[in-house]
Regions:
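Soluble or luminal CAZymes and related metallo-dependent hydrolases
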Residues: 22, 26, 71-72, 107-114
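A short, structure-level motif marking secondary-structure boundaries and short turns
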Residues: 15-16, 61-63, 102-105
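Glycine-centered loop/turn motif at secondary-structure junctions
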Residues: 38, 85, 123-126
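A metal-dependent, Asp-based hydrolase signature
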Residues: 45-99
Length: 135
């Protein structure tokens, strides 16, 4: 008898979208965190944005065929900020901070329609509920 239901978060329980404002805010967030840690990328905002976006594309090209997420210091040091000469060791002290900021700034998240009612219904049936996510 089934007594437990597990869900993925993104795309299953919630919708995720990105818009121009969240893109700009997340790039500014990266610059703010780096500045707070004494790091200056010596590039204008648009150049930084292009490099960071290219870094995310490189990470996606690595991750997607392998279906394997890396640690924040690997993502930011080997892919996202690699164009600026920052490696895993350089970003390790603030990699989690960058990852957290990116997740809450770059993405708009909202529960999908009727998710709350579905979860309440399952709970009312005595089901145990769980969420599995990589974020």
């Amino acid at each position: 008898m089934i007594d437990t239901v597990l869900f993925d978060m993104g795309g299953t329980l919630e919708d995720i979208r990105v818009d121009d404002e969240s893109r700009r805010s997340s790039i500014q967030g990266v610059l703010d965190i780096l500045h707070a840690h004494g790091v200056d990328l010596h590039a204008d905002f648009e150049a930084v944005a292009r490099s960071i976006n290219a870094g995310w594309d490189r990470y996606g090209a690595y991750r997607d065929p392998r279906q394997r997420e890396l640690k924040p210091e690997e993502i930011w040091g080997s892919y996202v900020l690699a164009d600026f000469g920052l490696d895993e060791e350089a970003v390790r002290p603030y990699a989690e901070e960058l990852a957290h900021m990116w997740e809450i700034t770059h993405y708009h998240r909202a529960l999908r329609p009727r998710v709350r009612e579905m979860l309440e219904g399952l709970k009312g049936m005595g089901m145990k509920l769980g969420v599995i996510s990589n974020t």
